[in-house]
A protein has these predicted regions:
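Propeptide-to-catalytic entry region of secreted or membrane-anchored zinc metalloproteases
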Residues: 1-123
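Structural recognition of the beta-strand scaffold that forms the well-ordered cores
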Residues: 25-28, 127-131, 156-157, 179-180, ...
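Solvent-exposed loop/turn segments at secondary-structure junctions
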Residues: 31-35, 133-138, 162-165, 187, ...
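Stable alpha-helical elements in mature extracytoplasmic
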Residues: 40, 44-47, 94, 113, ...
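Auxiliary, metal-adjacent structural segments of Zn-dependent hydrolase domains
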Residues: 106-150
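Short pre-active-site segment immediately N-terminal to the catalytic Zn-binding motif
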Residues: 154-174
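Catalytic Zn2+-binding segment of zinc metalloproteases
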Residues: 171, 176-194
Length: 249
């Protein structure tokens, strides 16, 4: 499975979302190609809150206390972006989605926004959620050792509906936030494999990184993911079987 051509180095404990601990500043940005009803945005915002509470509860299982501070743009007045490209889970998604939005909001770019956060928000970590009112496949942009400095700011691009048109679950939000903190996918994707999917089905069938569920409380943060996101420092060699191609030399 190793593909040295897309090796990016480790994504664990690096970037604006280093470890799932302490206080996390979560900036949500609502964008769409046309005006989007406030009530519908609030319906999705409640899913974000449900995902946050689930993360708090799961961290507590590992003996960690976390909290969230929320920021928001676009809730009252939608940020209109024409011709938004949707995620498709191919690895060819747009990775420069955050900076143009932050510039539109008055910042000079990703790093300028991070300086503002450090100066104005009492927090340990920061994640930006871009919520787009369009069907597609959500994805996260987690910082790695070999990615450009501006990608230090970690973010998620969240679709309100799956490609099928079905409304997205809170579990999808929690899944992508975990990616920002270094979690690996535990199912078959462009950078993993069927073998990883098989092992996860056997050992971690209810992992948030392996599958989704309409009821997020049926899912857990498994031991591999707990190590990846910093809820535990315990590492077993077995965990390395789940490493994606981007973190295998």
């Amino acid at each position: 499975m190793s593909k040295t051509s897309n090796y990016l180095g480790s994504s664990r404990n690096i970037g604006s979302a280093g470890k799932l601990e302490g206080k996390i500043y979560l900036l949500t940005v609502f964008e769409a190609e046309e005006e989007w009803a406030y009530e519908d945005k609030m319906k999705y915002y409640r899913k974000i809150r449900e995902a946050q509470q689930w993360l708090i509860n799961e961290a507590r299982r590992y003996g960690k206390n976390i909290s969230f501070e929320d920021g928001c743009f676009g809730l009252e007045e939608t940020i209109i972006i024409p011709d938004i490209k949707v995620g498709a889970g191919t690895g060819s998604e747009n990775v420069d989605i955050i900076e143009p939005i932050l510039i539109k909001l008055g910042y000079k770019g990703n790093l300028d926004f991070m300086e503002w956060v450090r100066a104005n928000i009492d927090c340990d970590h920061c994640v930006v959620l871009v919520v787009v009112n369009k069907a597609g496949r959500s994805y996260a942009l987690s910082h790695c050792e070999k990615t450009a400095p501006k990608f230090y700011l970690e973010s998620c691009f969240l679709h309100t509906r799956y490609s099928s048109g079905q409304p997205a679950y809170p579990a999808s939000i929690a899944h992508e936030i975990c990616h920002c903190f270094g979690a690996w996918d535990l199912y078959d994707t462009w950078q993993t494999s069927q073998e990883i999917d098989r092992l996860a089905s056997l050992h971690y069938p209810n992992s948030i990184m392996h599958r989704l569920d309409a009821d997020i409380n049926r899912l857990t943060i498994d031991e591999v993911t707990a190590w990846r996101v910093g809820l535990t420092e315990t590492h077993h060699d077995f965990y390395d079987n789940f490493a994606p191609s981007t973190e295998r030399q």
